[in-house]
Amino acid sequence: MGAKRVTVRGARTSPIHRMSSLTPLLLMGMLTSGLAESPVPTSAPRGFWALSENLTAVEGTTVKLWCGVRAPGSVVQWAKDGLLLGPNPKMPGFPRYSLEGDRAKGEFHLLIEACDLSDDAEYECQVGRSELGPELVSPKVILSILVSPKVLLLTPEAGSTVTWVAGQEYVVTCVSGDAKPAPDITFIQSGRTILDVSSNVNEGSEEKLCITEAEARVIPQSSDNGQLLVCEGSNPALDTPIKASFTMNILFPPGPPVIDWPGLNEGHVRAGENLELPCTARGGNPPATLQWLKNGKPVSTAWGTEHAQAVAHSVLVMTVRPEDHGARLSCQSYNSVSAGTQERSITLQVTFPPSAITILGSVSQSENKNVTLCCLTKSSRPRVLLRWWLGGRQLLPTDETVMDGLHGGHISMSNLTFLVRREDNGLPLTCEAFSDAFSKETFKKSLTLNVKYPAQKLWIEGPPEGQYIRTGTRVRLVCLAIGGNPDPSLIWFKDSRPVSEPRQPQEPRRVQLGSVEKSGSTFSRELVLIIGPPDNRAKFSCKAGQLSASTQLVVQFPPTNLTILANSSALRPGDALNLTCVSISSNPPVNLSWDKEGERLEDVAAKPQSAPFKGSAASRSVFLRVSSRDHGQRVTCRAHSEALRETVSSFYRFNVLYPPEFLGEQVRAVTVVEQGQVLLPVSVSANPAPEAFNWTFRGYRLSPAGGPRHRILSGGALQLWNVTRADDGFYQLHCQNSEGTAEALLKLDVHYAPTIRALRDPTEVNVGGSVDIVCTVDANPILPEMFSWERLGEEEEDLNLDDMEKVSKGSTGRLRIRQAKLSQAGAYQCIVDNGVAPAARGLVRLVVRFAPQVDQPTPLTKVAAAGDSTSSATLHCRARGVPNIDFTWTKNGVPLDLQDPRYTEHRYHQGVVHSSLLTIANVSAAQDYALFKCTATNALGSDHTNIQLVSISRPDPPLGLKVVSISPHSVGLEWKPGFDGGLPQRFQIRYEALETPGFLHVDVLPTQATTFTLTGLKPSTRYRIWLLASNALGDSGLTDKGIQVSVTTPGPDQAPEDTDHQLPTELPPGPPRLPLLPVLFAVGGLLLLSNASCVGGLLWRRRLRRLAEEISEKTEAGSEDRIRNEYEESQWTGDRDTRSSTVSTAEVDPNYYSMRDFSPQLPPTLEEVLYHQGAEGEDMAFPGHLHDEVERAYGPPGAWGPLYDEVRMDPYDLRWPEVQCEDPRGIYDQVAADMDAVEASSLPFELRGHLV
């Protein structure tokens, strides 16, 4: 909120008189609006025409104190409590103070922004002595700052809810924050101002500030519940008072409870009704707690509250019972501040009928006899009357009696005696209770009269006697009787014993005894039988009282039991056995016979025996001699009945004791794959079962309890897991039981994946020689076609093995190579697959030894260096060959003395690539500008290349400028850079249209590009195009052969010749606006040449000297950085050195190709690797690609990298792991010096020893 500005002015002029009368009103307006303007006195002191009077301002407003000086040229400043504020309008040290007004008019008003309590002081306007007047000091002006209270601290805490009890006295305190003047504090309770307030004014936290502490005494009433108690603070600095308040929660007791009885007769209710009594209590904070009591005991403590209306509800729900008669129901209400409980009660008057009627005495009696009965009711209110009914006829009671009952009720009793007759049988006998109080209800008790008399006739219905019934037939016998009460019981008997159903559920349900059924006056009971042998000739009878009837059944049944008896229980091979078959009982008699496994046996008859169930018995015997093959076989006895056409059989199983015998299906050989599991099965027969199975392998017994890799199963089989090839062999099994022993021999054939045991790596051969790559494996099984060979490489066309012979015999495979060629060198993989995964893979390198081949892309190579004896030059000679190569150097045909300190040679070996770097220090034009020859030699021959060391010069013209694409408006160009003279070079294209005079020039960007698309051409126009190379020493000239080309653009309708080239383009400058522009350029050039001819020589010599000095300084101080840049440029097209370069001459053209942009696809050389790693701790540097090779006809660049890749093979597993199949170009990126801590088996091939 921005500060408010107050302006105070005053002078002894007419405006001052007009304002003075309004001063009180202005002051009031300023205090209420936040603006403070100093009143101006009616008369100003001498020397002043306007001064402020005392002023009061609110904190945070802007105040202006007026000071009008009659001598404008004087130095005027203000003083605050005697402290001079200075004449500077900005008043350093007082950022809120400043002087305002027109000094020429003598206005020096003090403006105070955002005033605070520190500005409450006395101020003087002081005028310094000047030519126009003496020193002057104004009267003191007092500035009073009003500070409003920022906060009120209320106790209890503001914003909270305070709980009080109505009628009690409480103290509330309110403390204001710092203010000036002291604020006034007022308390407001529920909208009413509290008068009983005491206040104290105390010093504030700072000087001139005050705080007010007020205390009020409050006696709350119930009407204050939910209202606010507010503390208001005010002082002149506030537009509106500040407030703090809390909410009063007043506790007071509720009103009395009220019960709302449903109906007019309070307390009268009938038993069985669901009574709902609501009880309500109004008012109270907290709302009332309600509970119901019955005869002084709580029955319900559940209630609900409507807080908005402060009403508590509780409903008593009960089912009225007779015992509730006279009960007192009470509803009580109270809360936490109640002095006691308030209660409302109701007494119940319960009406209830008799809960039951009982008839005492027996209603069963023989005909023509008296029956005496008594009818008795339960207690009722009011009493009831009784009457008797027999069917629809009322009977008169003998006497009636009334007695007192429970719960204030009465008991009624009536006695009755009458004579029973046969026709009264089955009639209902009823005792009825009635009363006027229960007019709509009837209460009665009924019994059925039972008059007893006997049955008249009894008989049985079923199969006729003497009829044959087959066993298992379902027979139904029915016993019938007429008349009788009670109903005849109809009891069945079998041979004088009562018939009953089986009691056990598991017994076969052969007898089903029905219940007595009644149809009119006829009674029946059914007996269903599943006929069996025990029913043969049995007598079945039915009885009802003194009456009885019977019948007899004849049953046909096969042998009830066929038993085989043996003369011996323990049999051994060769023992004699006598078996007897006995048929216990059958009807009619049966024929017996014997057979063994379907073969009929001769038998003899035995002595007959008596038979149960009134049937016939039979027996026959057979004689046998047993063997071990009979064990478990059966001999069967068959009993056949012709009449029944049924045969009953029984068998005897041989139990022959004999020692173990191995069966014919016993397996003798088992095959398993290594690391798998196998089961050696056992097929043995023995009785008793073998007591032990003992396995031995190679003379060692296997533990019967099992081991880490074997377990003997309960059947004797041997289970092996994690089988290894060491488990291959014969296993002997020894079986034993109590009768003897037996042995068997089983062979385990373990198949395992092949493992390469011998693979000569590397395998060496001279070019044109013959060699066998031999691969020897350990495998099982050995298969004729398990060997295969692969050649590893990047070019698919170089990987076929059609020119090689594959031979295998047993565990050895051979790849036979005849007339070896260089192209056959490289990595070969022997793959062995015998059907057990995984296949074995072994990597072997074929090293084809050949004579040195020096990389010499052109007949002559040039290296540029300054010949001022301050710079150095490096000659790079690289050759390929196996075995190792030795280098020699000559200069102009004379062997170079490498003992000369100016010559330093470094040699590096990377696979088949060998390098020699010759560094010449302090190059001298007289001594070192010569033709150097590098010769590479090994045991198979030698080769050489020539390198010419020349001076730094202008670049050679580019070569091979040709058109690669053409369109109506553009021409695509391509060329080869020439020798750059040892300095960075750039290219410029000059072209002209033959029909239009004048030339146009275009700079090629980027500067290293060797392709460019010239655009902005006209269709159907012939152009002549030149290519120019330049460096810091000049350009290559335009008159040399092969740097210009003529071309005619096609018409707009013709298709472009080649659209496949995507070359960098740059729009050439547009055609000159004036045709004479080329002429003007030519004239200007002549004028410049005439002026420059005088100083050309001097500048040329100074430039050469400067270049030489720079080369010398950078050679001595930063040779390593310079050489690294050259290496990085060659390898990654980085920054280039400007003082040395390597170029090679063209084969036909005498011009030179620049080697800076030539990057053959070869693996990094060993010296390049050592350049980054350092060599033997020597602090030196050498160039990377100072002399780069150009592709030769014998193979593409990079083809040498993977030919001699290292093979890393585990001594125990010669298979080539997939994780070791790395990029072959990175195998030789280390040197032996850096590998002292590496195991010998992990060294690259060429570092394990020489090939010769």
From Swiss-Prot:
Disulfide bonds: C67-C125, C174-C231, C279-C331, C375-C431, C479-C542, C581-C637, C775-C830, C877-C934
Chief subcellular location: membrane
Record protein name field: Nephrin
Signal peptide region: 1-35
The record's account of how the chain is modified after translation: Phosphorylated at Tyr-1204 by FYN, leading to the recruitment and activation of phospholipase C-gamma-1/PLCG1. Tyrosine phosphorylation is reduced by high glucose levels. Dephosphorylated by tensin TNS2 which leads to reduced binding of NPHN1 to PIK3R1.
Any one GO biological process: slit diaphragm assembly
Record key words, sorted: Cell adhesion, Cell membrane, Developmental protein, Disulfide bond, Glycoprotein, Immunoglobulin domain, Membrane, Myogenesis, Phosphoprotein, Repeat, Signal, Transmembrane, Transmembrane helix
Matches recorded under Pfam families: C2-set_2, fn3, I-set, Ig_3
Bilayer topology: Single-pass type I membrane protein
GO molecular function: alpha-actinin binding; cell adhesion molecule binding; protein domain specific binding; spectrin binding
Compartments in which it is found: Cell membrane
Tissue-level expression: Strongly expressed in the podocytes of kidney glomeruli (at protein level) and at lower levels in the spleen.
InterPro entries on file: CD80_C2-set, Cell_adhesion_signaling, FN3_dom, FN3_sf, Ig-like_dom, Ig-like_dom_sf, Ig-like_fold, Ig_I-set
Quaternary structure annotation from Swiss-Prot or TrEMBL: Interacts with NPHS2 and with CD2AP (via C-terminal domain). Self-associates (via the Ig-like domains). Also interacts (via the Ig-like domains) with KIRREL1/NEPH1 and KIRREL2; the interaction with KIRREL1 is dependent on KIRREL1 glycosylation. Interacts with KIRREL3. Interacts with MAGI1 (via PDZ 2 and 3 domains) forming a tripartite complex with IGSF5/JAM4. Interacts with DDN; the interaction is direct. Forms a complex with ACTN4, CASK, IQGAP1, MAGI2, SPTAN1 and SPTBN1. Interacts with phosphatidylinositol 3-kinase regulatory subunit PIK3R1; the interaction is reduced by high glucose levels.
Residue stretches spanning the membrane: 1079-1099
Family: Belongs to the immunoglobulin superfamily.
Positions bearing carbohydrate: N54, N370, N561, N578, N591, N722
Domain Ig-like C2-type, residue spans: 39-144, 149-247, 256-347, 354-448, 454-554, 558-649, 754-846, 852-953
Cytoplasmic side: 1100-1252
Region of interest: Disordered: 1043-1067, 1113-1144
Modified sites of kind Phosphoserine: S446, S1112, S1119
Annotated Gene Ontology cellular component terms: basement membrane; cell periphery; cell projection; cell-cell junction; focal adhesion; plasma membrane; protein-containing complex; slit diaphragm
Function: Seems to play a role in the development or function of the kidney glomerular filtration barrier. Regulates glomerular vascular permeability. May anchor the podocyte slit diaphragm to the actin cytoskeleton. Plays a role in skeletal muscle formation through regulation of myoblast fusion.
PROSITE patterns noted in UniProt: FN3 (PS50853), IG_LIKE (PS50835)
Positions carrying Phosphotyrosine: Y1204
Post-translational modification Phosphothreonine, affected residues: T1115
